[in-house]
């Protein structure tokens, strides 16, 4: 059975994007690093910011691509090749429009659902056989509003809900790392 060796937090690089809904994946790995007293360092060769942590006695690389969302797969594939990490050993944390704020879901494989970061990862890895932690940000209501919505900051109440979902996901991280997925899915997917 595989174990997670890389956690990718999707988002856009730069202060202007740091607090936007599209960066909730980055918030997730930043919280993991903070909880483990680790900081990120820039790795220009691998097109990302990296931190290394130990979770339940497993060495895990935290990756924040510095390629912007639409080309995240470049960094993910470079890091995976460098550390010899298989797609099944990767967890990607990302924003999810189709899930309400405050909720979080775990998924193995699946399509990109219009998410350009996932689309890029699928293309660069040549597969969608990796785990995804889908952090709910809610939907603005109409397709035409999506781009502005994901690139804007959440309200204070919504930010609190998203932070709560991130904390909830981190509570199950040991089991996710060790591929004990069924009990995690049951707990996360049950209201």
Swiss-Prot record:
The record marks 95 as: Stabilizes the basic form of H active site to accept a proton. Pfam families: Pept_tRNA_hydro. It is an enzyme of class 3 (hydrolase). PROSITE patterns: PEPT_TRNA_HYDROL_2 (PS01196). Hydrolyzes ribosome-free peptidyl-tRNAs (with 1 or more amino acids incorporated), which drop off the ribosome during protein synthesis, or as a result of ribosome stalling. CDD domains: PTH. The record marks 12 as: Discriminates between blocked and unblocked aminoacyl-tRNA. It comes from Francisella tularensis subsp. holarctica (strain LVS). InterPro entries: Pept_tRNA_hydro, Pept_tRNA_hydro_CS, Pept_tRNA_hydro_sf. The keyword Hydrolase applies. The active site is at residue 22. The keyword Cytoplasm applies. GO terms for molecular function: peptidyl-tRNA hydrolase activity; tRNA binding. GO terms for cellular component: cytoplasm. Its EC number is 3.1.1.29. GO terms for biological process: protein quality control for misfolded or incompletely synthesized proteins; rescue of stalled ribosome. Belongs to the PTH family. TRNA binds at residues 17, 68, 70, 116. It catalyses: an N-acyl-L-alpha-aminoacyl-tRNA + H2O = an N-acyl-L-amino acid + a tRNA + H(+). This is Peptidyl-tRNA hydrolase. PANTHER family: PEPTIDYL-TRNA HYDROLASE. It comes from the Bacteria. Its main location: cytoplasm. The gene is pth. Gene3D superfamilies: Peptidyl-tRNA hydrolase.
